[in-house]
Design a protein with these regions (language model features):
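Short, ordered loop/turn segments at secondary-structure junctions
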Residues: 49, 122-125, 169, 195-196, ...
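Iron-sulfur cluster-binding cysteine motifs and their immediate structural context
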Residues: 216-238, 245, 249-266
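Glycine/aspartate-rich loop-and-adjacent alpha/beta segment that forms the canonical ThDP
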Residues: 181-232
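Acidic-glycine-rich active-site phosphate/pyrophosphate-binding loop
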Residues: 41-56
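Glycine-rich, acidic loop regions that bind phosphate or pyrophosphate groups
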Residues: 1
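Short, small-residue-biased leader/transition segments that mark boundaries at the very start
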Residues: 8-21
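Thiamine diphosphate
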Residues: 55-192, 202-206
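Active-site pocket-lining segments that scaffold enzyme catalytic pockets across diverse folds
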Residues: 20-41
């Protein structure tokens, strides 16, 4: 037993650790959406969840974070204070669980007060930041029992939103098209980017690899900030196969076919 008057000695180790900012997971479906917003130079009123990390470089698109549900009400407030033209390069971003928690009432207020603006619901089918709990739109209770699932697109339409667009978060061309079209409208628009959290699917995925002989060192694949991507000393890029989830975002950005799937026999 160890008593109060006893002393103990231990060796102290001094480690030199690389400074690292908090970032989205490899393969996170939010990363492609934020890449598009960054590319289009659109600001985002943020909310509480994994997607808050969109404030961190190199994505750097989330400019406000107050509390759960405040992304939509912040966008609403900007529109009323500064006018609809001011928010043409702004969107609100909010997760599916947070939208059902306190975002839906903010969207109701936008409709009630005849606001304009674009809301992006980042629907990853879970409550990712706090441990992957189910919520009212997943179809399961917290005990894992089947239950009624709230239909988020139908809920938005029931509130009165006429412009409800659903896209695959992995399809960055579709995301970009939807964002460009909806922010141009003088009405409330809701874009729902629907792709499950990468941590929910434990199945084996195809991996990607780079061909340094084809790499032009342009850095396009590095812009989304995937932690599996590393720039080598010579400017080419390598992919860490222990971190790659096979999402394919990097390959979709490479114009030189320098990133391709690893063949099954080459793993």
């Amino acid at each position: 037993p160890f008593f109060f008057n006893d002393t103990a000695t231990t060796e102290i180790y001094t480690l030199s650790l690389h400074d690292a900012l908090p970032i989205l997971c490899p393969g996170c479906p939010h990363r492609g959406v934020y890449y598009v917003l960054n590319k289009l130079k659109i600001h985002a009123a943020g909310d509480i969840g994994c997607y808050t990390l969109g404030a961190v470089a190199p994505l750097s698109v989330v400019d406000t974070t107050i509390c759960m549900g405040a992304s939509i009400s912040s966008l609403h407030g900007m529109e009323k204070a500064k006018g609809k033209e001011y928010i043409k390069n702004w969107v609100a971003v909010i997760g599916d669980s947070t939208f059902l928690h306190t975002g839906v009432n903010s969207l109701m207020n936008m409709m009630y007060n005849k606001a304009t603006g674009t809301v992006i619901i980042l629907d990853n089918s879970t409550t990712g930041m706090t441990g992957h709990q189910d919520h009212a739109a997943t179809g399961k209770t917290l005990q894992g029992d089947p239950t009624y699932a709230i239909d988020i697109p139908a809920l938005c339409r029931a509130i009165g939103v006429k412009n409800v667009v659903e896209v695959n978060a992995r399809d960055i061309q579709a995301v970009e098209k939807a964002v460009k079209e909806e922010i141009a409208k003088d009405e409330v628009s809701v874009i729902i980017t629907k792709t499950p959290c990468v941590l929910l699917d434990k199945s084996k995925k195809p991996l990607y690899q780079t061909h340094t002989d084809k790499c032009k060192k342009c850095g396009m694949c590095m812009k989304p900030g995937c932690p599996a991507m590393t720039k080598n000393a010579d400017g080419t890029v390598s992919i860490d196969d222990t971190m790659c989830t096979g999402c394919g975002l990097c390959a979709s950005l490479c114009k030189f076919d320098a990133i391709e799937l690893v063949k099954e026999g080459d793993r």
